[in-house]
Amino acid sequence: MIEIEKITLYHLSMNLKKPFKNSIETLQERKFLIVEAIDTSGVTGWGEVSAFSSPWYTEETIGTCLHMLKDFFIPNVVGREFNHPSEVPDSLARYKGNRMAKAGLESAVWDIYAKKKGVSLAEALGGTRDKVPAGVVVGLAPLDDMLKEIESYQKEGYQRIKIKIQPGQDVELVKAIRSRFPTIPLMADANSSYELKDISRLKELDDYHLMMIEQPLQADDIVDHRHLQKHLKTAICLDESICSVDDARRAIELGSCKIINIKPSRVGGLTEALKIHDLCKEHHMQVWCGGMLETGISRAQNVALASLPQFTIPGDISSSSRYWDEDIVTPDIRIDNGFISVSKQPGLGVEVNQDIMRKYVTKMDVFTQHG
């Protein structure tokens, strides 16, 4: 039994080591809400709200998440008894959407649950691997800079490279990278920057043996993705289009993609992520675990999730040093010969370094059973 006695929200502001650009936004500063939940037996769990500051990825932002957590979700969870973390999303189901806010809260309860059971989060989720392959993302930049970055990551052992593309920086960019790295596992992420009328342009990418094209069309264009996939040899991977197991079911039934990116934050938490994983396993749909420029709290969670059997493609799970001069967890997330070890320690398997985190905390909100 888990009864949450106290929740603290830490508002963090951290600077990336260098700006990260995609087809929509350039990111330098990253804001987070870190969730610390303590149950009545004194066990602490950690979660992370990974929404961005502006609604370029989904409609959620750090600001909207804060509102939903303070005014609706946390009052609904504090003082309530849960037998299992999957009961948390059930308790919040009457509130529509706001999945990233829900995910941050639920993940803290998963951490508590695993710690009380004396098992790793990976084991609690049903993971079967002791290490997961590491992949990395390269943002849009001048070609020479991107080539140098890819070469550096290849030397570090990353098993898959994802590049961002957009109209005007696509076919020639991929061609140049393929010319330099003819055999490297390579995929392209469009972040919804194309329309169905661009089909001939996207078909040109078939010549470069990409693992996949991620989210070429708008998030709600699931039918258009079906039409596009029929004309492409390259597999389409859906990201923003998949926010629930029902979205995944529709995409599978329509044939809108061949691969699905599962991000716990995007789909509302680990419980929904497990449902999507199991559905994809049933339908032999490949999946991989995406990332969102997160701290080690979410990275540790993603490593645990990616240890499940249907995660057959290296995910966006890179070392802490990819984005941060220092992470807020110990040990930080590191790759070794192209893999990240799955922790066997109870819970997330990492500890929040309070001394480091305090450097980046701008505000705190505390919630208890008695207000």
Curated annotation (Swiss-Prot):
Highest taxon of the lineage: Bacteria
Keywords: Lyase, Magnesium, Menaquinone biosynthesis, Metal-binding
Coiled-coil ranges per UniProt: none
GO MF terms held by the record: magnesium ion binding; O-succinylbenzoate synthase activity
Cofactor: a divalent metal cation
Enzyme class label: lyase
Gene Ontology biological-process entries: menaquinone biosynthetic process
Protein's job: Converts 2-succinyl-6-hydroxy-2,4-cyclohexadiene-1-carboxylate (SHCHC) to 2-succinylbenzoate (OSB). Does not show detectable N-acylamino acid racemase (NAAAR) activity with N-acetyl-S-methionine as substrate.
Similarity section: Belongs to the mandelate racemase/muconate lactonizing enzyme family. MenC type 2 subfamily.
PANTHER family: O-SUCCINYLBENZOATE SYNTHASE, O-SUCCINYLBENZOATE SYNTHASE-RELATED
Listed name of the protein: o-succinylbenzoate synthase
Gene: menC
